[in-house]
Amino acid sequence: MNNQTFITQFLLLGLPIPEEHQHLFYALFLVMYLTTILGNLLIIVLVQLDSQLHTPMYLFLSNLSFSDLCFSSVTMPKLLQNMRSQDTSIPYGGCLAQTYFFMVFGDMESFLLVAMAYDRYVAICFPLHYTSIMSPKLCTCLVLLLWMLTTSHAMMHTLLAARLSFCENNVVLNFFCDLFVLLKLACSDTYINELMIFIMSTLLIIIPFFLIVMSYARIISSILKVPSTQGICKVFSTCGSHLSVVSLFYGTIIGLYLCPAGNNSTVKEMVMAMMYTVVTPMLNPFIYSLRNRDMKRALIRVICSMKITL
């Protein structure tokens, strides 16, 4: 038998930042995190307050903003805390909780991007039937179903990880408890964990990405049948924001998991993890607000109504 130690805590390696630059990066990450919180909260509030945004697209967008807000909050507070103190430990239960919520909100973003792509497909290819196909009841049920799927999927992987045994090495080579890193630390058999990750990754990453590509292929095909400058402009104005977010989200995932790793794979994994846990959630509100007339008009209406009330 191997000598096994009951692990009560893990040590997060953190980001490879020189000591003299810690304060600078702490301030940078704090500003990025606060920007993420405020930007996504603004979208959620606007969608709730402005009746003209009570549409399927903005239902999905508000849930995406909530998911982004929580996704960043899973890792950033602990990272900021560790940068201000010498104690980088995280309790065993806290590590599993971080892994669970990281998967919940990461999966939810992937699902919501598919739902938003389908919404754009119906709006452009079947405009006369849009309200009947994308009914409020259907969209609400779809969002609830997606939350149930993501929480169940995350719970399955978390429970499988909880059954693993860990030996003396408890240093997590990342700034948060990533499931892949935890499996490398386990000294018990991880075959079931790896098998389920492979199966579920196919279902939750590859298939959603394929569905998004298919939706936009149908949109492009529909536009090409009746080519016009107005039609092309409509597609870009309607889908540009969503395509930008899809590119950011899946671009980082492809860069992290599909590109070959070099000698500095740990640093690369941390950088890519920062991209999709911090940078992408921060940029999403700017992408949707700067390229979306409805959001700009809604913001003006809400501000004007507040002035009238005051």
Curated annotation (Swiss-Prot):
Olfactory epithelium. GO terms for cellular component: plasma membrane. Glycans are attached at residue 3. Keywords: Cell membrane, Disulfide bond, G-protein coupled receptor, Glycoprotein, Membrane, Olfaction, Receptor, Sensory transduction, Transducer, Transmembrane, Transmembrane helix. Gene3D superfamilies: Rhodopsin 7-helix transmembrane proteins (1.20.1070.10). It is found in: Cell membrane. GO terms for molecular function: G protein-coupled receptor activity; olfactory receptor activity. Pfam families: 7tm_4. One of its GO terms (biological process) is signal transduction. Residues 49-55, 119-137, 218-234, 291-310 are cytoplasmic. It is a multi-pass membrane protein. CDD domains: 7tmA_OR1_7-like. The chain crosses the membrane at residues 24-48, 56-77, 99-118, 138-156, 195-217, 235-258, 271-290. Disulfide bonds join 95-187. Residues 1-23, 78-98, 157-194, 259-270 are extracellular. It comes from the Eukaryota. Odorant receptor. Belongs to the G-protein coupled receptor 1 family. This is Olfactory receptor 1496. The lineage of its organism: Eukaryota, Metazoa, Chordata, Craniata, Vertebrata.
